[in-house]
Amino acid sequence: MIRRAPGGGAPLRAAGTLLFLAAWEAIGRSGLWGESFPALSTIGGVFVNDASRNLLLRALGRTAESASYGLTLGAIAALLLACASSLWPRLRTGLDALATGIYAIPTITFGPVFILVAGPEATPIVLSALSAYFPIFVALDSGLRFAPAAQRDLAVVLGASRARAFGRVDFPAALPAFVDGLRLAAPGAVLGAVLGEWFGAPRGLGVVIISSLQNVRIPQLWAAALLCVTCSLLAYVLLSALHRQAHRRYAW
């Protein structure tokens, strides 16, 4: 059997990325898809202008803040309800239905409701939390269900209560799944924050996207969109590193 060396695919991934960026630049410069698809160099020129750069960076900070709060709130809600589902199995059907219902309804449809209830400042955080809740709940609930039964039964036989066995066996075993849920939820949290900013928030990348679209500032629109992608990827990469640490530390 031939085994690939660790990281052996990195040069291929880098080459693919460079090829994609070169193709984007060539298509943008050729005008093949019109002015709505600018070259990367044109988009990068937006950051040369001090006013545009400061606007985008302030908006990025606001969106990242909303997404961070939303991811945290979604994670707390998912953590509490998944643990409740594991400790009290009678609640499982209802909590599973709640998670499915939140996932089935498009997040953007909640926007007008939360504008009235929570206000424009809080709506990006709430939509971000809703977007993050489902993947974290499903991942953690699955991890708790497949926790090692033998170790749990041994703890109970040795006199541990159900709650104590949960804290000593089930939850530590499910931690890698919980972090995996965080990793999968992070891009959705950013998207939820951006969608929430479309409903009247005063600041954020979503506001810049709408403003750029209305004023036909195509390069600035693309710059804001690429910052959203960068923010999502950065969160995913950081949480992937945390997931590897959790897997090495707690995986059975």
Enumerate the predicted regions with their spans.
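C-terminal transmembrane helix and the adjacent membrane-cytosol boundary/short C-terminal tail
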Residues: P89, R145, P176, D180, ...
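Transmembrane-helix boundary motif in ABC transporter permease subunits
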Residues: Y69-A99, P112
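Periplasmic/extracellular loop-to-transmembrane helix junction in inner-membrane transport proteins
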Residues: I2-A5, R29-L73
